[in-house]
């Protein structure tokens, strides 16, 4: 009976350690996402995010891959494009700059690459767009 209790104690202790490690990872990802939400309209990079969190850039990539199956760079791009899509529906003219793209051409290129349509077509016919 003592052996069984000792073994259970060890198992639960190990589980507790693993849960704390997972929570720490999740906190880094949550803070990274908060940073993205607050700064997406600026010219930020994955290095900026990692430095803000005080962690290694490679580690940040790994955390995002585990959590979202994509890089933080891809997450940032998707967030910018979805924000732009919402602004297109509202008719905002300075969408590219407001969403952190350096110029309208880069924005249009990325938008078309991801959504297979131009921002102008999306603005004209938002009801026809395929939503992710």
What role is predicted for each listed range?
Residues 34, 38, 43, 47, ...:
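Terminal helix-turn-helix DNA-binding modules in bacterial transcription factors
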Residues 118:
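Conserved phosphate-coupling serine/threonine residues in phosphotransfer and NTP-handling enzymes
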Residues 43-57:
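Aromatic-anchored, glycine/proline-accented short structural segments
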Residues 1-37, 55-61:
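An amphipathic alpha-helical interaction segment
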């Amino acid at each position: 009976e003592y052996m069984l209790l000792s073994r259970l104690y060890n198992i639960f202790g190990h589980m507790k350690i693993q849960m704390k490690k997972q929570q720490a990872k999740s906190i880094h990802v949550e803070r990274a996402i908060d940073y993205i939400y607050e700064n997406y309209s600026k010219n930020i990079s994955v290095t900026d995010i990692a430095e803000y969190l005080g962690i290694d850039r490679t580690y940040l990539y790994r955390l995002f891959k585990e959590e979202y199956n994509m890089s933080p760079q891809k997450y940032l791009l998707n967030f910018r494009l979805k924000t732009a899509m919402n602004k297109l529906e509202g008719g905002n003219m300075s969408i590219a700059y407001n969403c952190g793209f350096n110029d309208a051409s880069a924005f249009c290129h990325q938008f078309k690459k991801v959504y297979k349509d131009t921002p102008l077509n999306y603005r004209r016919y938002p009801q026809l767009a395929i939503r992710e």
